[in-house]
């Protein structure tokens, strides 16, 4: 029988090194946050992410690693320059090979539908993935590590390319499912 659950392995020594380098502590909630995506219709607003991170940090002492590439630096800077920025570390200047052990040292990921969500899932993180303009039935249901959010009025089956639902992702649903993820 074929197991569709992907699994990515990371060297334990590399994970231990990044835990020391980035002061990743077990008593904190450590998240990978991926606020970017391949296009603007697949991105939940950066201000929503800022508000979400603030709320999560009120509930649990948290550290947020903001994943993205060079093209995402302005987006990430908005988060770093916000009131929650002191709890955030940008990964935009790192290669995927450098980011993977950092991801493996974390427990949770909250992402738009992007490659970082799938890497986090493969590393065994509990993931909340926001699908707003792509089909979660194709890209999100393969993994037990992925919890899915779709726009209000859509379902896992109906959400797809051209849904253009980024403004219909409900903040309360994302917050509630984020809190459920860590419990």
Describe every region a protein language model picked out:
Residues 45-132:
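Donor-binding and catalytic core of enzymes assembling or modifying cell-surface/extracellular glycoconjugates
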Residues 10-12, 96-99, 153-158:
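A short acidic, often aromatic-flanked loop/helix-cap motif at beta-alpha or helix-coil junctions
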Residues 90, 118-183:
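Nucleotide-sugar donor-binding patch of glycosyltransferase catalytic domains
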